[in-house]
Amino acid sequence: IPAAYEVPMSEGLPCFWQKLTEGRKRYDFTLTPLAGGAENEFNLFCVADPQCQNTTNIARFNNETVPDIAAQVAASTLPCYGITLGDIGWNTENTDYTNDVFPLMKKAMQMDKVGLPLFQLMGNHDNKVIAVSKNDYTVAHDIAAQRNFEYIFGPVNYSFDRGNVHIVAMDNIIFPSHKDYSLGFRDDQVEWLRQDLSYVPKDKMVIFCVHIPMRASNNQNVQAVLELLKPFAEVHIMSGHTHYAENNTYDSHYEHVHGAACGAWWHSTINTDGTPNGYAIYKVKGATIDNWVYKATGFDPDFQIRLYRGSDIF
């Protein structure tokens, strides 16, 4: 999606893709110019790990997270966009919940509810559970595991522009099975990213969205991806997965590991490190992130830290 054009919407979610049909060579699309041209300033909402396993979890997401995001969008004077950072659903070793959960989560995240175009990104728990041993794993298994997600939400690797920013979303999970998944990128993904970034001016900021934190890992093709990002003036990596908050810097990259919207898997209202359930809001100005805040669900944006006396009983 070019920076100076609206995000096309369908069924309440961004719709920038079409399913390919064998034998069809032409795919048409329409772009609508933004009234004021490309936006020099905007807010980007990053929502990690809704991780809803059942209707009880979805009800909490609908009643807590969704209206909280909508209220922040309504209070903003800037254009607002959003992206999830994976684990929208929650598969388990023996049961695949994603067929039931995905359609309900798609409804929960529509623009008329959250107030902004909310792009989607795949996490390890969004893969379809396929019975295959790690030794028998092939690229075909990894691709097959992402088909349920693609059917509901669209591609797992894509990019779009807003303002002077190039935003990339990628599936960084190698998925032989529910237990054996690992951080990494297939060779074809690295080549796709290389081609994608070849069209992006080096003075643009790149926001690179994945599920599993990168942390300068030596896992499959991670270093190759980081090398592709290195030439850009400012790079922010947005990730989730951990259910705790963390910040990492390496090379010219700043990685934001986000606390989960579901906290500790909807068992309470906090993550495993005590961070409240929530999401992040980034204020983008030109080709830099001017400011950001972790927005705790149900609290004012100024609510950022709380200390307890260690000798007290709670």
Regions found by a protein language model. Give the residues of each.
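Short acidic, glycine-rich surface-loop motifs adjacent to enzyme active sites
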Residues: 197-217
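Metal-dependent phosphoesterase/phosphodiesterase active-site architecture
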Residues: 9-20, 26, 48-51, 66-71, ...
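N-terminal active-site segment of His-dependent metallophosphoesterases
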Residues: 6, 11-14, 20-96
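Active-site glycine-centered loops adjacent to acidic/histidine catalytic or metal-binding residues
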Residues: 49, 86-87, 123-124, 211, ...
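Extended active-site neighborhood of metal-dependent phosphoesterases/phosphodiesterases
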Residues: 93-194, 198-200, 223-238, 247-284
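Alpha/beta-hydrolase fold active-site loops
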Residues: 42, 80, 157, 164-165, ...
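Residue-level marker for buried hydrophobic side chains located in beta-strands
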Residues: 44-46, 82-84, 120, 208, ...
